[in-house]
Amino acid sequence: MNNVIKISEHFWIFEEDGVRSFLFEGDERAMLIDTGFGTLQIREMVAGLTDLPVFLVNTHTDKDHTGCNKDFKPVYMHPAEMEHYQNSLPEGCCMEDVCPLWEGDVIDLGHWKFEVILTPGHTPGSIMLLEREKRMLISGDTIQNGDIFMFGAGRNMQAFQNSLKKMIAMADAFDSIWPSHGSYPLTADIIPGILKGAQDMEAGKLLGQEPPWPMPCKKYVCDVVAFLY
């Protein structure tokens, strides 16, 4: 399976056209984080890696993270994300399958324990998942070195900057960052650069370029990341 990368025992990544999903196998159940665009047969790929029951957590619900949501139940997300999800509900999905995850909740898989951290801005209910013992952070789209989409419904640049400040304050809790886009793993050193880029963009210090595809935005490039805004 060329799209599957085994990172360590009980931890795999699925790569799909610039976006990735994560699978963590626990003692009695497994957790899938996001489901990509839907071009991969993620359900079959997961079944080939674990015999355990699988539940799904969405870091957020942009369409490149929910393409195979219909194949998994239940689907967990922060309640602040549910309206965003409902407004573009993927085919075959229904809100009855959605369960809430709140900030501070701990997803206990046995040898994996992930704490939910609310980091709005990219979307209203974007979350990260922190494994404190293994010192790793699943960051969704908020911390990455690719293109961060900050135009359109649900985006909030001030909330985004506040979320970055929150993660800077928590940086002593993790060593590796596993984003949905760009390269991996990253370290916490990148977060101040993302924040500075966002601040410089708002201050008019970055030159807006034409986006890579026809979109109602400009592309702003800083040292560590680019914003589509």
What residue ranges belong to the model's regions?
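Accessory terminal helices/loops
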Residues: 165-229
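Short, solvent-exposed loop/turn segments at secondary-structure boundaries
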Residues: 37, 89, 149-154, 189-190
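Metallo-beta-lactamase
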Residues: 5-8, 74-125, 131-134, 146, ...
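Active-site environment of divalent metal-dependent phosphoester hydrolases
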Residues: 38-41, 61-67, 83-84, 124-126, ...
